[in-house]
Amino acid sequence: MSGDHLHNDSQIEADFRLNDSHKHKDKHKDREHRHKEHKKEKDREKSKHSNSEHKDSEKKHKEKEKTKHKDGSSEKHKDKHKDRDKEKRKEEKVRASGDAKIKKEKENGFSSPPQIKDEPEDDGYFVPPKEDIKPLKRPRDEDDADYKPKKIKTEDTKKEKKRKLEEEEDGKLKKPKNKDKDKKVPEPDNKKKKPKKEEEQKWKWWEEERYPEGIKWKFLEHKGPVFAPPYEPLPENVKFYYDGKVMKLSPKAEEVATFFAKMLDHEYTTKEIFRKNFFKDWRKEMTNEEKNIITNLSKCDFTQMSQYFKAQTEARKQMSKEEKLKIKEENEKLLKEYGFCIMDNHKERIANFKIEPPGLFRGRGNHPKMGMLKRRIMPEDIIINCSKDAKVPSPPPGHKWKEVRHDNKVTWLVSWTENIQGSIKYIMLNPSSRIKGEKDWQKYETARRLKKCVDKIRNQYREDWKSKEMKVRQRAVALYFIDKLALRAGNEKEEGETADTVGCCSLRVEHINLHPELDGQEYVVEFDFLGKDSIRYYNKVPVEKRVFKNLQLFMENKQPEDDLFDRLNTGILNKHLQDLMEGLTAKVFRTYNASITLQQQLKELTAPDENIPAKILSYNRANRAVAILCNHQRAPPKTFEKSMMNLQTKIDAKKEQLADARRDLKSAKADAKVMKDAKTKKVVESKKKAVQRLEEQLMKLEVQATDREENKQIALGTSKLNYLDPRITVAWCKKWGVPIEKIYNKTQREKFAWAIDMADEDYEF
């Protein structure tokens, strides 16, 4: 309580000075009238200051002021011992008020005493009411509130009651307290604490011991999925017409009709297979009466429906900030409740907690099932997966789950079977989760193991090109394509069930052309087929002579629609790969070749003397080489031409600014030669810096334009997220001083937190 004694001593000295001044007044009564008002003002200021310190001193000053007004100079003859007695009583009150006074003194600029550490029960209790804290917008009020009860438990009950009574008696204390808080600005303390909180939340699972083989988690609890909202019927003024006449549809039929109306301007609705599949499934939802009337899709008029949905879309765009904020808050509330799960005592983000709403299936490419109705998923379709000791999520009222499982050998939380392809859909964890991160890490470690034996495997398949067995030769040539061209293995599919996409094992004779010589190169194979997601793979590749001869042999006496590798399937190939190396698949080859290509390209393209924008361009070029290898293509964005025009406008404007700056520099240099003083030299230096700054800005814009042009038909993201060991990128960034934020966005940094933490600049794939 050393701070209290210092404060009390200063108060006693103030009282002594007050008494001395009154004695001085007795001797010089003529001066009293001149200075009386001035001294009253000073006394009031002292009284106000004392108010902000503690309530007891305020009462003392009030009593003094009352005495002054009543008796005039009666305080002149007060005994000093009486003052000291009052000070003693004051000290006793201060002790009784405990830490409340200490806190007030601290807030008013007094240094806190060392003994405060011995009284933690008071430290967090004396907090201003919510209405006083609210304007400060403290982000951790809730956390502090959670901590208070622990401190209150050790609080003396009598002291607590006394303090509350004192606060009620004197409401004025609250305002100075907040004023002082405003002066002190407590926010920086919160800002310092906040990063610590975030650090605590980061689970460095890669530093922990891994679970036994096959075990994915020990505890799992979640809230289940969020279902699509129920259908809202169209307003009465929005009509559907059949054969020129208004027709009122039943709710089920109307809902399916709206799916088509929403896509009315889309290319899909002009495709015959889409229209045929839609009409077939739509009729299943109609009543018998509707089926009898609606027999031809061409006679259906969805125009008013389509216009209604366009107007709704436009209205959403025109929403006020308040309306948008309200929707955002609702989404955040939903995310907070359903977007996280508890896995092994850690809060993990869920990737897709919302069930997809009903609609019309589109598919990729010319999918044979496009236009079919994706039915509404109900709770009765849902399988829940959680711990036995976890609280099972409650289904919506009036419904029940299909099944509740407790399988800790799988990573999904929720599953259901969709009706179009009969495939199983899952709700999984976010890519930044431990489970996803471990899977990625394991994938890249497997690819690194391939590096040790890839030469042996390559020698083996070269030997197999000469095998007496056709099956072995075909397998060896297919493996050569998977290795050299990063082709996917290609799965067998039922005809008519999916789009006609192929991989290496399912290539047909029609997909390749052989050229003994083409464009000055020998033994060229021309590939042309639809790969995954119906993306065209077109490539002209020079191959080794023995591969070329084998392909000629495989194509003998075959029709265009016949399989190129008729003695091979993915099962046979994958079994052979497992024999070569445990865990080896066609995807491991793709991952290995993608990562090793990135590492090699970065070494070749990165120049030590380049600035950051130039280094980023080098990185993107290395990434592009991988994307081309893996055939990660995309259609140029619709806004590409417009964005390039805007960028060129910026470049032209920057060039003009640079030309002006150079003229200014030249003029300043001429002045400096004539004037030869310090002021003109400073002007020259300033102009030089301006020119340098503009040159850097221009270079950044030009690099950006080059990058956009080169990447307009290449998808860099797919390889970056799925095939490139992130540790290669992290090591490159650390080695060349490139901020990791320039390569990975926030989501990607969360996904690759394990790589960012563990890789140093010397990492080699």
UniProtKB/Swiss-Prot annotation:
It comes from Homo sapiens (Human). Keywords: Acetylation, Biological rhythms, Chromosomal rearrangement, DNA-binding, Host-virus interaction, Isomerase, Isopeptide bond, Nucleus, Phosphoprotein, Proto-oncogene, Topoisomerase, Ubl conjugation. There is a cross-link at residues 101, 103, 117, 134, 148, 153, 158, 164, 172, 204, 336, 549, 642, 700, 712 (Glycyl lysine isopeptide (Lys-Gly) (interchain with G-Cter in SUMO2)). Eukaryotic topoisomerase I and II can relax both negative and positive supercoils, whereas prokaryotic enzymes relax only negative supercoils. Sumoylated. Lys-117 is the main site of sumoylation. Sumoylation plays a role in partitioning TOP1 between nucleoli and nucleoplasm. Levels are dramatically increased on camptothecin (CPT) treatment. It is linked to A chromosomal aberration involving TOP1 is found in a form of therapy-related myelodysplastic syndrome. Translocation t(11;20)(p15;q11) with NUP98. The gene is TOP1. It catalyses: ATP-independent breakage of single-stranded DNA, followed by passage and rejoining. GO terms for biological process: animal organ regeneration; cellular response to luteinizing hormone stimulus; chromatin remodeling; chromosome segregation; circadian regulation of gene expression; circadian rhythm; DNA replication; DNA topological change. This is DNA topoisomerase 1. One of its GO terms (cellular component) is nucleus. The modification Phosphoserine is found at residues 2, 10, 57, 112, 506. There is a cross-link at residue 117 (Glycyl lysine isopeptide (Lys-Gly) (interchain with G-Cter in SUMO1)). Pfam families: Topo_C_assoc, Topoisom_I, Topoisom_I_N. The modification N-acetylserine is found at residue 2. Changing residue 532 to A: Almost abolishes enzyme activity. Changing residue 326 to R: In breast cancer; somatic mutation.
